[in-house]
């Protein structure tokens, strides 16, 4: 049927054009027509404008969203109706402009529940929980969405006390809950690692009949795993009738993080379908366990099966290469990334720098750092400074820190740790003390136990025990294992028996099963010729069933890394003769180098 009114023809054409482009997300072209349509006196339908605003928000197209807002003002809608105002609020919040959203909200003639929830949700997603709370408290009425938003907002922010308070108040309000009501509670369980809280949440989900919800069940399993309760996690897993890939991966990750790689790999093999995340969970577990070779074997198998690695897969495998100082494996991973056009993120680039450094190729580390497109991430600088520290280049590390500050990159707590280590390994006591003061005064970094441990190591290695004791007395907290370890380490270097004995006693109290304090104290006694105390200490270790951890060494033979321990000499190591031959040659090189110095 032909359009009789000629004024309606451009409206229909415009509507058709904009609708078409909105569905294709070609917002720039669609919105660019608004000005010409306005000049023709065409007022667009509300539902079309609402649809465009929603797409602007979803694609974070702020410029186009503002054009639509301007179109509304020009065409006489300085105060749009409730529908359009709600969409404007949503668009501004999604585009990270909560102040603009607040202006729209304040100018509304009539607000509905969706308007209030939109503001609360927007503030929560922007991390502005104080403002979200103010709006929530001002609401004339609330529904399940209002309460769910506040619970999950506080839980994700790590404010577990407030999250639980809101959850309890919500349940007391009498408003009917839904499956999403447990999402915030379970997020709090995962973050708090409180077993009793998780059991209560598990019980409530079970009673409510929502255990079939895969997301909730996955959170319950994750919470049990983080509490170290793998039996409960596995029981929950076994009771599930529907298991998706995320459930399997969560349980595998739980076993891997607790070091039970046998259970993790068994479950991995039983998986009906595997994805890059499940492969990465297993690889990362072996890296944490110190089994770099096994992690790299899995990576090669993953590639052979055509599974595409993700960013965390690369960072884990590069850490595996670094842990066994295998430059060849690290280069292979780097080469694969280049061949497959992988654009590495900050963590992967830092892992590359670290891998090359620990594999003895500092030049390659510096080359990777130089070609970084964006050096505004503090992680790059920290890793490079740490690499220079590992190679004993303290002065160069200090120059790198100066460059970092000139580049207007704000140092963080890790920066202070790595620069103190750099100064410690190069004997730069004055420079280390200067940066310790500078970081706290100029950059607002509050020193923690790890920073003081580094400072003690710096002073102790240089033999400045008076200054060391003064710093210990000035600490605003009681020493923890980091600090006592640092004290014992420097006492071992300088043979300070009295302070070393005190540090060892404190470490044994903190971690009775660790053999490290016994061994270091035993070395101090041995250096002083006090063999009766050495024997006595060994007797104490035997009585308390403290076993010395075996030190593992790696050596590359025919492009394969072989691991061996001291005790392997008396056993049938598969490649014992080849290892002996290489070690004999290395010893000869070391003796020759030593004779030259």
Curated annotation (Swiss-Prot):
Describe the family membership recorded for this protein in Swiss-Prot or TrEMBL: Belongs to the PPR family. PCMP-E subfamily.
Report each PPR repeat as a residue range. Answer: 45-79, 81-111, 112-142, 143-177, 178-212, 213-243, 244-274, 275-309, 310-344, 345-375, 377-411, 412-447, 448-478
Ranges for the region named Type E(+) motif are 559-591
Q: Which domain of life is it from?
A: Eukaryota
Which residue ranges traverse the bilayer? none
Q: Taxonomy-wise, where does this protein's organism fall, top ranks first?
A: Eukaryota, Viridiplantae, Streptophyta, Embryophyta, Tracheophyta
Q: State whether keyword Cytoplasm applies.
A: no
- Any one GO MF annotation of this record: RNA binding
Stretches the record annotates as Type E motif: 483-558
Gene Ontology BP, a term: RNA modification
Q: What is this protein called?
A: Pentatricopeptide repeat-containing protein At2g21090
Q: Which UniProt keywords apply?
A: Repeat
Identify the species of origin.
Arabidopsis thaliana
